[in-house]
Amino acid sequence: MRQNTIRGFTIPELIITLGVAAIILSTAVPGVSTTIKNNRLATRVNDIITDIHFARSEAAKRDVRVILCRSSNPNSSSPQCSTDSGNDYTWTSGYLIFADSGTAANSIYNAGSDILLRRGQPAPSGVRMRTNPTWNRNLEFNPNGSIHEGSTAIMSICDDRGKEDGRQIIVSLSGIPKMYSDNISTCTPAYPDT
């Protein structure tokens, strides 16, 4: 005679298994969130550093000033550089890279005479990008690759975690960018100690 064996979990076994799974998930989910935020910041920093290298090399290649300017409409059919006279210092909306080859050479993108080289996309949600006064509206590269402004340019890229997890890009007078991620001084380089 065959005896049927019933297989399955008892209620206490099921409750214990679900409890262990809940504990594991409660420790893993915040780690995944941190990884996503770190990757979001790293991707943005890498994109900007790549574009800085691109702008610098194009200035040397074309023998003209190449400008990376902030823009509130980089994906528009007629994009423009931000021309506000205030001290906004925010670059989250995107930017343009263009060869200032027109007769005006005025650091303002003019579709009729300047050459649009690249459009920088807006920052991902939750990512803030702020600069110091040197880099306020634009970062200009001379044909020799140096920055036009004559002082170090700084951009801080942070999220809701603040400066402890933020990144900074510092462009030296020679035009070479470097990224810093350990204990950056501020998320708003235009206003020290904030």
Protein language model features and the residues they cover:
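Short glycine-rich loop/turn motifs that provide flexible caps or phosphate-binding loops at active sites
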Residues: 7, 18-21, 144, 174
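Residue-level "hotspot" positions that anchor or transmit function at local structural transition points
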Residues: 12-15, 89
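Alpha-helical hydrophobic helix detector
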Residues: 14-31
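N-terminal helix-rich module
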Residues: 2, 27-42, 46-49, 53, ...
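Conserved, well-structured beta-alpha core segment at the onset of a catalytic domain
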Residues: 10, 19, 36
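N-terminal leader/signal peptides at the extreme start of proteins
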Residues: 1-11
